Amino acid sequence: MTAEQAHGQGGYIGKALRRREDVRFVQGQGRYVDDIVLPGVAWCAFVRSPHAHARIRALSTKAAAMRPGVLLTLTAEDWAKAGHGELTVVHPMSFSDGRPMNAAPRPAFARGKVHHIGDIVAAVVAESRFAAEEAAEAVEVDYSPLPAVVAVRAAVAPAAPLVHAQFGTNVVFEIERGNRRRTEAAMASAAKVVELDLKNNRLSANPIEPRSYLCDYDAANDCYTLYATSQQPHYLRRWLSVYTLHIPEHKLRVISPDVGGGFGAKGIFSTEVSTGVWAAQLLRRPVKWTATRTETFLSDAQARDHDTTARMGFDRHGRIVAMQIDTLAALGAKLLRYAPSAAKVSTCIATMRPWRSKPMRAVVS
């Protein structure tokens, strides 16, 4: 379309446009993952930790395996025996001094310890959703609770309990952008300095449609079809292929039908989908999982939770002469794919770039 056509008669600029995609949704004709029913489908349910931090002293699925309709139980031990992989961060962030990021991988099942409420310790697959959820309650887990913190400033205190002891700290990375010396000098000479402490609360996307996965395994051709509530189906296929199940990419088809809200949470690769695909392959039949609303709050990717101290220096005419931002970003007990880079972008890039060139400094941890 030429510029003349866009602005002229029959063009679109400056005119209200009639939406064309809404009719089938308001008539109840949308097709979501949970609407898809395959013959012989089995259901998956997960056993999740009720503790924010605890040692797993014992785990037994024997009682659950004997429940009516149960087809399969899975734990970290089974995952390791199968040789499957773990999730890693897509965009790692290093420290400003060059040290690598303190990033622990995300296993499909907790091993030895749980690191947050909702951490998965086992899975049960059964003939029906009810049977799977009932059997999941029969899985026996002996926990030994450990100290935990939920506030980001408490997490960086000297005596804070460590989420991943091997790093010796709860700080994942620290990046500084800008010129510290020039910013401090400009701030010292400013006619007025305003300082503000800001709390950007943690949030859950909580879409109307919860996360849901349905995997169909074709044993004759050794290939998979995965229906997923995913905002990024191509990435999802690659992650299953490269990082976790090591399925050749050409043997895995991922379909995202209508998605009932995502807001970023459905763009994150979750561990539940790996388990469902694996279970479908083991059982040679379709396997489905749809999160409950409780699971949505416990296990969906969350956002924000930043504690920020912002300082701005002004000259006697009220013009900005310097700006300094220090942010603590709570990334959770287990890193999600883009979380570190998102914290960097929101603090170091989105905050600094709109302003005219002047001494600025931003630090995000």
Model region roles, listed by residue range:
Residues 1-173, 193-196, 282:
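Flexible, low-hydrophobicity surface segments
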